[in-house]
Curated annotation (Swiss-Prot):
PANTHER family: METHYLTRANSFERASE, RIBOSOMAL RNA LARGE SUBUNIT METHYLTRANSFERASE H. S-adenosyl-L-methionine binds at residues 85, 116, 135-140. This is Ribosomal RNA large subunit methyltransferase H. Its EC number is 2.1.1.177. Pfam families: SPOUT_MTase. It is an enzyme of class 2 (transferase). Disulfide bonds: none annotated.
Length: 166
């Protein structure tokens, strides 16, 4: 069993004008749940969903990101190894993710992977992140990025020599 904990922090709601609604892709939730279950025998995995800042038509995205940063900081511990998913960072392969997981196993007791809000991640959070990675240059709905759980499972199977990756 790997000797670290893994948390994924994401934002739960998307807001347009005054309407706030949950995006619920059941197939995404089902997929996340499946890989969480597979990983649970190997690595404790927790999904932490945070509310986004209230948006208005005339609001300021920079202020929204600052508000979301305060929420994120309230969830982080000093010992957390913060990894942010950032479209402008280096795209990594599954094999590179496996290498990172191997490093986390020996050097970081609690890894937090942050999926930013609809407007991105505030600079104050980027400044404290230990690592910044990109899974793609494409834009995905934020709930869909939870598929990172499959990549974490796949990376772990690479480390264990399991045939899942082939």
């Amino acid at each position: 069993m790997m000797a670290f904990l893994l948390d994924i922090i994401t934002f739960l709601q998307i807001s347009f004008s005054t309407n706030i609604f949950r995006i619920n892709y059941k197939w995404v939730s089902d997929g996340y749940d499946e890989y969480k279950k597979r990983l649970s025998k190997l690595i404790p995995l927790e999904l932490i969903e945070l509310p986004i800042a209230k948006r208005t038509k005339t609001g300021n995205p920079k202020l929204w990101m600052e508000q979301e940063a305060k929420t994120i900081l309230g969830k982080l511990n000093d010992s957390d190894h913060l990894v942010i998913l950032d479209v402008n960072s280096k795209i990594i392969s599954t094999e590179e993710l496996a290498d990172k997981m191997q490093n986390w196993k020996f050097n970081n007791p609690n890894v937090v992977i942050l999926i930013g809000g609809p407007d991105g991640i505030d600079q104050s959070i980027k400044d404290i992140a230990k690592e910044k990675i990109s899974i793609s240059k494409m834009t995905f709905p934020h709930p869909l990025v939870r598929i990172i759980a499959e990549q974490l499972y796949r990376a772990y199977t690479i480390l264990e020599g399991h045939p899942y990756h082939k």
